[in-house]
Amino acid sequence: MGKIIGIDLGTTNSCVAVMEGGEPTVIANSEGARTTPSVVSFQANGERLVGQVAKRQAITNPDKTVISIKRHMGTGYKVDIDGKQYSPQEISAMVLQKIKADAESYLGETVTQAVITVPAYFNDSQRQATKDAGKIAGLEVLRIINEPTAASLAYGLDKTDSAHKILVYDLGGGTFDVSILDLGDGVFEVLSTNGDTKLGGDDFDEKIMKYIADEFKASNGIDLMQDKMAVQRLKEASEKAKIELSASQQTNINLPFITADATGPKHIDLTLSRAKFNEITHDLVERSIEPMRKALADAKLSLNDIDKIILVGGSTRIPAVVEAVKNFTGKEPSKGVNPDECVAVGAAIQAGVLTGEVKDVVLLDVTPLTLGIETAGGIATPLIERNTTIPTKKSQVFSTAADNQTSVEINVVQGERQMAMDNKSLGQFTLSGIAPAPRGIPQIEVTFDIDANGIVKVSALDKGTGKEANITITASTNLSDDEVDKAVKEAEKFAEEDKKRKEKVEAVNNADQTIYQIEKTLNEVGDKATEDEKAAVRAKIEDLKKVKDGDDVEATKAAIEAVNQSFYPIATKMYQQAGGAEGAADPNAAAGGAQSAPHDDNVVDADFKVDEDK
């Protein structure tokens, strides 16, 4: 059985980990970083950039750079790139493909299975969309687990011998969750969860952006929010300012040539203090307090019952957030986990539980929202209350609302409101073939079945006729099986195109290095080679220059080989004349490591990486 990776698919950054030798290890990406920006950029030449390289060029390509797509998971939102519509699942799959490739590079083997985390307060549509994203990326998602629960696994794996209750406060880039867990004897039991899927670090950035834009407009009469490139620069500057204010009392925001008018170019040079930042983001911090209060109430606990407070997510580095949690709970938050990595680490531990690598750990998670159906008068009748341990199954008998009714339409809803229309409709299905009878006589048993991923199945049975209908919830905003399959094929096609593009870049890079090194050697060789020998090599170099920028990678490789072969006699002479017996044994070494396959692929790869980092 191959390795199962654990993925924290975040709003702003993602992270991947794997179990090695019984311990979770965070995998660095191809750029050497332990987290990868969840950013996708589409280039004019059809190339797709993902991660840090995509984030770096967002200012110059704002229309074709997609950020924070996680906030739209499970909705009908589409991204339009050059007339092609992309769903949030497809964009997320591009991020997952990058993560998968980095994991495969690290492990040296193909990765096909993963555990992926989601915010605890994600509804069924959002969870299903996340699973679809994994499938499109070529991953079988064995388990969807809640982010705070994953963080608790990372925190508590080495503390399974002591019983204690923890409150996990998870404020990420785009979502907020709070979960209360009971840890003891290797059992991680979620007692309650609450949250806000529209609260995160992005909102803090937006507050700073608005403040800067308002100040600039007041001084210059220009609305920067109408200029896409200026907005992207403001976004980057706001995120940077937020991060700096976590360590400093003030920061300088300097954006030269942000725009221009008839009087000339305009610049931003603004000092933002931590006190001002706290003032403009106070309402966001306050929004996180009520979910903590509700989670405690649902768990039937008081603050005195909580033993530890765990902070998760990059946004918990904001001093005002830490202070608010401390003031509310009366406890100093634990520093026992890395807020950026612990969710991925927890996902890897869960993967280890599934493979049997991690023993004596049991995870009991809950459904975050109440599930029910719409009944007469538009009332939402609950079947499974929020914070019920999953997997679970629950049945309830209903009847018809009219005489001689032969079918019923069942509207499945998720949420805490009294009326069905105020909750999220997960899907509808019809039970037909009910025997005609006065209203209230037929007995229709509705059964809800929630699996360990939090994915819902609903069935209805007419107990009189034995007729049955069922639905696996796939809301209209999710992709159909055909759409997922199509997206999988497109993702595979892009992966193949990316591979070819990389081969071409490597071949061109190899050619340039070969040309440079051998031309340099020819200029230094003096009378150790005849003019005819030099001319023969230069002719092959000219042939290489003609083909290297074309699309035929094999022709480029052949031309490189021809240059190397033509240089071989000169290299041999050089070493013989120098009396270098060892050198004569490897005349190709005179080319300074510029050779291509089949001589020395490793050297070429190293050159390629250095150029890429520049």
UniProtKB/Swiss-Prot annotation:
Keywords: ATP-binding, Chaperone, Nucleotide-binding, Phosphoprotein, Stress response. GO terms for molecular function: ATP binding; ATP-dependent protein folding chaperone; unfolded protein binding. The modification Phosphothreonine is found at T175. Belongs to the heat shock protein 70 family. Coiled coil: none annotated. Gene3D superfamilies: 1.20.1270.10, 3.30.420.40, Actin, Chain A, domain 4, Substrate Binding Domain Of DNAk, Chain A, domain 1. InterPro entries: ATPase_NBD, Chaperone_DnaK, Heat_shock_70_CS, HSP70_C_sf, HSP70_peptide-bd_sf, Hsp_70_fam. This is Chaperone protein DnaK. Residues 583-597 have a biased composition (Low complexity). HAMAP family: DnaK. Residues 598-614 have a biased composition (Basic and acidic residues). Residues 577-614 are annotated as: Disordered. NCBIfam families: PRK00290.1, prok_dnaK. Acts as a chaperone. The keyword Membrane does not apply. Induction: By stress conditions e.g. heat shock. It comes from Clostridium beijerinckii (strain ATCC 51743 / NCIMB 8052) (Clostridium acetobutylicum). Disulfide bonds: none annotated.
